[in-house]
Every structure is written in C-alpha cells, then in structure tokens.
C-alpha cells in the first residue's frame, strides 16, 4: 500500500470451500493464513469461525460466502503504508490447492491505496501446473494495469533457485476469451526484429513499473509483461 492513512484490506485463504462448493480436486483441507510486514507477524488465522464482522465484509466486497463452520481462513486488517506478505501454509505432512485473495475493503477512501500485488508459485507447462491470478476492475471507467510473469529475473537478480527459464503470461476475460498474451516482455509478439518498437515498448513498461513500485525487468530477459487498458469486469 502507499499514500497516507491506513487501508482496510480483506485477506482470505480458501481451501475446504474450493472442494465442497467448486469441486476443486486436492483442495487444501486446513489452510493457515499469516500476514507479515517484513519479518514481523501482523496477524494469523486458521479457522475464520463464521464471524459476523467478516461475513459483512465478504458481502461488501463481493466475495463468495464461506461456510460458518468451514476451516477456511480470513483476516480483516487496517494497514499503514508499506509492503506486506500474506503466506498460506498447510499442517505438517499435508498439502493441497488453496485460493489466496486480497480485497480493498474501502475503495472509496483515498489517499491510501493498493499499488501492486504479486505471488510466487511453482509452475509448469501442463494446465494443472498453471498459476492463475484473477483480478477485478470495478466502477464505470476503464483502468490501465501492468501484468508481469517474472521467471528468469528471479534467478539472475534475486538468486532464486529453480526460477522459470521462460515465462508466458496471458489475460482472459470472465467468459474465457483471451485478450492478450506475451512471452518476451521486450517484444509485442510480432515475430519480427523492429528495434525501435521494442525500445518504445520497453520504455513504456519501465515507466509503468515505476508508477506502481515494481523493479525494472532486465533488457533482453525472457520474462513476460503486458500493459493493458481494460474495461470494468
């Protein structure tokens, strides 16, 4: 978050409900959600407990309901500006699929705002190994978003082992129609060698990264990125 004042955020780690309500196989049976500011634990939750306060926030932000006795996890926090991490863990000896969500619970209260959100996961070429990150644009006007699939730079810049060597990012609407895709961030998928267009694209993406507090991707890397103006949805 950035700006002045606190920002109210809803965080959820949905596991059991993925299985019971959405028939997701191998859903995580008992997620634990822990919020960090740097290395400091801000709050943690294991079972949301059917809280009336949390239920009201679910409704406010348009999140699907959770069963009052489900073992899903949820937190509502008022966060000062800074970088935070929401980490989902499983009990010892278990694993499964979880949905991690972050909602702006007071979107009409600037100047505090959510600037960017990122997630790290192990991905592969098969559909079951795809990382899916959804987002929603509310209101009545279009908004411009920067979407990046960072793989190689995690290794070269941050020393992360097993970093993906060549990432691919695609954006779909709610009907499943593909809106855009990219494999090499400095090229727009044309398949030619237009250096001037490539440089313009890289400059635009660098400027967008600056505006939302993201680091610059190295020129020539096989990371992927898209800068899109999208209608509400």
Language-model-derived ranges and their functions:
Residues 1-233:
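A sequence-level detector for low-complexity, Ser/Thr- and acidic-rich stretches
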């Amino acid at each position: 978050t950035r700006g002045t004042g606190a920002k109210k955020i809803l965080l959820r780690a949905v596991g059991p409900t993925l299985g019971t309500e959405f028939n997701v196989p191998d859903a995580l049976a008992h997620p634990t959600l822990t919020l960090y500011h740097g290395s400091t634990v801000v709050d943690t939750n294991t079972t949301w407990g059917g809280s009336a306060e949390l239920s009201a926030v679910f409704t406010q932000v348009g999140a699907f309901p959770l069963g009052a006795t489900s073992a899903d996890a949820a937190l509502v926090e008022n966060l000062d500006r800074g970088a935070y991490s929401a980490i989902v863990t499983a009990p010892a000896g278990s694993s499964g699929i979880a949905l991690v969500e972050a909602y702006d619970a007071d979107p009409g209260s600037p100047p505090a705002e959510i600037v960017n959100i990122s997630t790290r996961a192990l991905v592969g070429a098969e559909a079951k190994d795809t990382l899916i990150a959804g987002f929603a644009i509310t209101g009545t006007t279009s908004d411009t978003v920067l979407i990046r699939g960072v793989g190689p730079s995690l290794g070269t810049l941050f020393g992360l082992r097993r970093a993906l060597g060549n990432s691919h990012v695609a954006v779909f609407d709610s009907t499943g129609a593909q809106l855009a895709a990219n494999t090499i961030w400095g090229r727009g998928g044309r398949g030619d060698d237009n250096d001037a267009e490539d440089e313009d694209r890289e400059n635009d993406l660098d400027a967008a990264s600056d505006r939302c507090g993201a680091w610059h991707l190295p020129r020539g890397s096989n990371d992927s990125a898209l800068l899109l103006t999208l209608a509400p949805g």
